[in-house]
């Protein structure tokens, strides 16, 4: 139930005119802004910091200046809210405890009514478009490794002064294996045997169960999968609750992207996944008989990463 979800790539536009110059063409504007922010320091950019969240307004800038503002957030989760966006923001995210960047995943979810700016992943001047202006699809989550870069938020040209707010929530999640990032970035791609075995040991939830119903929500570009669980291996949050009948089963709901095309099916599956922004997101989900085969093969070779019951 996991498939490659292609990320949109692109460069920011050039909303602010610059005088022509002879010789080689100047660098792209977003890269130029980043360089200026580093060179000018306090002279050409503002610096803001807060433990978890930041809220600011472009109205504090002089009308003729398109500033790049540095925002430093040192927390596991929070939000950024930028009213009347002008210029650009460089959002620096770090955990509030020591942890190597290569072990951290950043996930962002834009506000439903977010507009006025594009959100990019930036590293050494290269930009990858994460959330285009106005794409505030509810529930849409974008994730990347912290070592892949930082967030560059660039205001888009506007013809009026109507109120616009660019905003998003963020989470910093410690990942135990590289496969955890695949789960976030490619939730529809089928898992390999190794990924399944790691998922059952390291996911926020792992259960054996069947699909009772699937509710597609086009407005969220999401599908809600309603599960009946016969065996609960692990869960960090109360995703699954005992059924009212008290027959030893549990029930709960997990989510995945609409594009994965999940449908109700017969038989038991192993469902694994992680919590993001308070919701259970589906990761690896092989048929249970296939998981039994994977686990048995790994056990015979002494390669199973943890002990679980497969009866």
From Swiss-Prot:
Q: Which UniProt keywords apply?
A: Disulfide bond, Hormone, Secreted, Signal
Biased composition, class Low complexity, residue ranges: 1-13
Q: In the record, what terms sit under GO molecular function?
A: hormone activity
The positions making up the signal sequence are 1-45
Please give the residue ranges the record annotates as the region Disordered.
1-24
Query: Which cysteine pairs are covalently linked by disulfides here?
Result: 52-75, 107-143, 188-260, 191-284, 201-306
Where does it live in the cell? Answer: Secreted
Q: Tell me the tissue specificity.
A: Highly expressed in the skeletal muscle, in subcutaneous adipose tissue, epididymal white adipose tissue depots and heart. Also expressed in brown adipose tissues and kidney.
Q: Which GO terms describe its cellular component?
A: extracellular exosome; extracellular space
**Record carries keyword Secreted:** yes
Its family remark reads: Belongs to the meteorin family.
Task: Name the PANTHER family on file.
Answer: METEORIN-LIKE PROTEIN
Q: What is this protein called?
A: Meteorin-like protein
* Organism of provenance: Homo sapiens (Human)
Q: Which gene encodes it?
A: METRNL
């Amino acid at each position: 139930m996991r498939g490659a979800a292609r990320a949109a790539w692109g460069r920011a536009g050039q909303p602010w005119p610059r005088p022509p110059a002879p010789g080689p063409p100047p660098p792209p504007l977003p890269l130029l802004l980043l360089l200026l922010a580093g060179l000018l320091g306090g002279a050409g950019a503002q610096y803001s910091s807060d433990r978890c969240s930041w809220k600011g307004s472009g109205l504090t800038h002089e009308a003729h200046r398109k500033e790049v503002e540095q925002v430093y957030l040192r927390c596991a989760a929070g939000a950024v809210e930028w009213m009347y966006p002008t210029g650009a923001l460089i959002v620096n995210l770090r955990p509030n405890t020591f942890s190597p960047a290569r072990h951290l995943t950043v996930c962002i979810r834009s506000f439903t009514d977010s507009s006025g700016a594009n959100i990019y992943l930036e590293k050494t001047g290269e930009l990858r478009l994460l959330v285009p202006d106005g794409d505030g699809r509810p529930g849409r989550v974008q994730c990347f490794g912290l070592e892949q870069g930082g967030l560059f938020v660039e205001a888009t040209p506007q013809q009026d002064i109507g109120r616009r707010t660019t905003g998003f929530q963020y989470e910093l999640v410690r990942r135990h294996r590289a496969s955890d990032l695949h789960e976030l970035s490619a939730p529809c791609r089928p898992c390999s045997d190794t990924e399944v075995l790691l998922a059952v040991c390291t996911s926020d939830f792992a259960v054996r169960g069947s699909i009772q119903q699937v509710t597609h929500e086009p407005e969220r570009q999401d599908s809600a999968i309603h599960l009946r669980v016969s065996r609960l291996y692990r869960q960090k949050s109360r995703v699954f609750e005992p059924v009212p009948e008290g027959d030893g089963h549990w029930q709960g709901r997990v989510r995945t992207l609409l594009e994965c095309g999940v449908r109700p099916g017969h038989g038991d599956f192993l469902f694994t996944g992680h919590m993001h922004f308070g919701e259970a997101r589906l990761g690896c989900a092989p048929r249970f008989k296939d998981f039994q085969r994977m686990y048995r093969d790994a056990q015979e070779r002494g390669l199973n990463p943890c002990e679980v019951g497969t009866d």
